[in-house]
Amino acid sequence: MDAEWSADTRRRAALHGLLADPARVAIVDLLAWSDASPSELGARLGLASNLLAHHVGVLARHGIVRRHRSEGDRRRTYLALVPGALDGVGAAGPARPAPSRVVFVCTANSARSQLAAAAWQRVSPLPTASAGTHPAERVASGALRAARRHRLPPLGEPRSLGDVLVDGDYVITVCDRAHEEAPGLAAGHWSVPDPVRRGDEDAFEAALAQIERRVADLAPRFTGPATTG
């Protein structure tokens, strides 16, 4: 008699089959750390555009990868892993040495990067900071209310990149415009929609939910004590 496998066992077996190709594993490994445009992925992996498009298409059709339009350059798309799609298959990619500090960057340093740094403080002992490419005069009121609702550490005043970044920082952009304005600056990119554009509480809740999920996923994947210098 054939064994009657559970739905979850069948799901994980199918995922292992999809990830049997080294190129797809490499794509998933990179996206586990950072959202990326197809051109960024191709450059990192050395894959021809048609071959990359094939593998991304397979991953997208099976609900592992999603595409979305940039909030900055509307001609540009970003690829990201679908939350929970790879649960149970151990496909998070290799760990990395802990940096001296994690710095979150957005354009105005008034919402997303502030919330990301505050969320990071709650789950990781690694030092953190936030900055903006064009800092606003003050933190968005919606971000302050969201931080209070979720009992996050107090948010700081908006600061510019030049006043914050030092050698050894691990930079994560949480804003498409900032990522595109300073190519090569960030070690990682999270394409988080700008809640200030909508301005309502739901927008800030959605942004913070995505940030908290990604912070919780990233923090334990740094290994060892923080590096210095």
Where do the PLM segments sit?
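N-terminal helix-turn-helix DNA-binding core of bacterial DNA-binding proteins
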Residues: 10-51, 77-84
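Phosphate-binding/catalytic loops
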Residues: 179-229
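Conserved active-site segments centered on acidic
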Residues: 96-162
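Short, polar loop motifs at secondary-structure junctions
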Residues: 172-180
